[in-house]
Regions:
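N-terminal secretory/membrane-targeting segments
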Residues: 1-58, 512, 516
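Anion-binding catalytic surfaces of enzymes that hydrolyze or transfer phosphate/sulfate esters
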Residues: 9-11, 21-23, 152, 159-213, ...
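Catalytic metal-binding/acid-base residues of hydrolase active sites
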Residues: 68-69, 189-191, 236-238, 262
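Substrate-binding rim/cap in mid-to-C-terminal beta-strand-loop elements of soluble/periplasmic
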Residues: 100-110, 246-289
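Phosphate/adenylate-binding glycine loop and adjacent helical scaffold
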Residues: 304-368, 392, 396-399, 465
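Alpha-helical transmembrane segments of integral membrane proteins
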Residues: 354-516
Length: 516
């Protein structure tokens, strides 16, 4: 009898040790698991500008202020100047508000689900075509100036010249970075850094916004809006406490302004899909569309509200409208092949692929349920006691949610903000929740031996959830992207698995010392 009990205790201890190791491996590996720069379900459509644009802008300045909230952008003098000269809109940057994926979205016209750009770490070029590559292929010269190399890394064939300023005190808009070329991409980083370090509602953030306002004003002084084109936007905003990555309004909704040659003037703040940024540049510059841009269930009709229509460019705009319809038709035909029936729409395709993920979730849940039942039978836990344990596990999940919400916030990428802050706070959340759960068990059940067994059950459930995430969503993370909580879970889940695994190991060792 004792020998069998010792064997079960040793097996439980082994499971907990394995869980701790798996937690470390999956947690550290999740960042690398996110991206796949070959992309997913790319539809390539060949385009040709059959009617040339009558007059192309002399210089184009495309400005991405990293981490600029919409409310802060509205206070900038340069944004107000661009609004008077053209139009500003509220741009929806999607639900994956991480910087490198947003650079991909702005440049290609495609969402992160399909570009495959899902983290800031992977430096490999993106398969989806960018507007910068289109511009160079059309004979234009493209320059970049940034505190990061990420635009150039994503699209190495998209730039003739790229100035990388490692010193973030440097002005990326300054003339010493070279004369203005046909197309110029400017990307300052310090507003985002202020948001991470101090929060989007802090005086330091406001000071960074004031700095970029002044530096952009210096750039505008070198331009002539009767001849040149300026686009001002951001990749994402910041929450008040700092952080981005989720789909909160203050994070995903940013200001985008178009002003200069070829831009229609309007004073309202109409809606805009961030995926339409690259297509809008294509229309205003007289370029073909990026071949992989989103078409079908899109926001491309806004292009005809941004471009100023005149008798001189009527034929050109008609040609571009026809091109958009060709893109939509080709996407529809391709989707009908993939779906096997009509109508071929992106929402239907997303729904089908998400449905496959849901079925895998169901299979995982069934497997976990069977394992839990077998665990109860192996431990000879009566039905009533099993129900109490089930309620206790549910209570433990509720405790985790409450403590996480109180300390970190929403269950999404936004709470990560800075790694050096997130890791100790998330570890504290997991430890507090684990201790509270243990104390609740001691108070309700009052059986230390059963506590150790039930804690091992929790560790097994967490382990199954972490491995199940890989089974459900793939390695690398597949298509479509998981919902926000499931997208974030491997970060916190790994920390919880390690924490609960160590607590369970401690309980098992204590129980062994107490056993006769």
């Amino acid at each position: 009898m004792r020998q069998a009990r010792d064997w079960r205790r040793l097996a439980a201890l082994g499971l907990c040790v394995v869980a701790v190791v798996v937690g470390f491996v999956l947690g550290e590996g999740y960042i690398d698991r996110l991206p796949q720069h070959a992309g997913y379900f790319l539809v390539a459509v060949d385009d040709e500008v059959r009617v040339p644009i009558p007059t192309r802008p002399r210089h184009t300045a495309f400005i991405v202020v990293d981490g600029l909230r919409r409310d802060s952008a509205e206070t900038m003098h340069v944004a107000q100047e661009l609004a008077r000269a053209g139009q500003c809109r509220i741009s929806d940057q999607g639900s994956f508000t991480v910087s490198r994926p947003e650079y991909a979205l702005l440049s290609t016209g495609l969402e992160a689900d399909r570009t495959g750009s899902r983290n800031n770490d992977l430096t490999a070029p993106l398969a989806a075509e960018s507007i910068w590559q289109v511009a160079r292929a059309s004979g234009l010269h493209v320059a970049g100036s940034s505190h990061l190399r990420w635009f150039e890394q994503l699209f190495p064939a998209g730039f003739d010249r790229f100035a990388h300023e490692k010193d973030h005190r440097a002005n990326v808009f300054a003339p010493e970075h070279g004369e203005l070329l046909d197309v110029n991409v400017f990307h300052p980083l310090y507003v985002d850094e202020a948001g991470h370090q101090h929060g989007g509602a802090s005086p330091a953030y406001a000071a960074a916004v004031a700095r970029v306002d002044g530096e952009i004003a210096g750039l505008l002084a070198r331009l002539d809006l009767s001849q040149d084109l300026v686009v001002l936007t951001a990749d994402h905003g910041h929450r008040d406490a700092g952080g981005h990555g989720g789909a909160q309004p203050e994070i995903k909704n940013v200001l985008v302004c178009f002003a200069g040659r070829g831009v229609e003037r309007r004073s309202d703040r109409a809606a805009f899909d961030g995926r339409s940024t690259a297509p809008a540049l294509a229309v205003l510059l007289g370029l073909r569309f990026p071949r992989n841009m989103r078409a079908g269930d899109d926001g491309l009709d806004v292009l005809w509200e941004i471009a100023h229509a005149t008798p001189e460019n009527a034929a050109y705009l008609a040609d571009r409208r026809a091109a958009v319809e060709r893109f939509r038709t080709q996407n529809r035909i391709t989707l009908e092949k993939w779906l096997g029936d009509q109508p071929g729409t992106w929402p239907r395709f997303y729904e089908r692929e998400a449905g496959a993920q849901t079925r895998r979730i169901g299979a995982t849940a069934l497997f976990v349920l069977v394992c839990a039942v077998l665990s109860f039978r192996l431990r000879k836990v009566p039905a009533r006691a099993a129900l109490v344990t089930t309620a206790w596990v549910a209570f433990g999940m509720f405790v985790v949610w409450c403590v996480h919400h109180a300390v970190l916030g929403d269950f999404d990428f936004t709470v990560i903000n800075l790694r050096e802050r997130f890791l100790p706070r998330a570890s504290a959340v997991a430890l507090v929740a684990a201790v509270a759960t243990v104390l609740a068990h001691l108070w309700i059940v009052g059986d230390r031996r059963r506590l150790a067994g039930d804690m091992v059950l929790v560790v097994g459930l967490l382990l199954a959830a972490m491995l199940g995430h890989v089974y459900v969503y793939g390695w690398p993370l597949g298509f479509p992207l998981p919902p926000q909580p499931a997208r974030y879970f491997p970060f916190f889940g790994a920390i919880a698995l390690v924490t609960y695994g160590l607590v369970a190991c401690g309980l098992l060792l204590l129980e062994r010392r107490r056993s006769p």
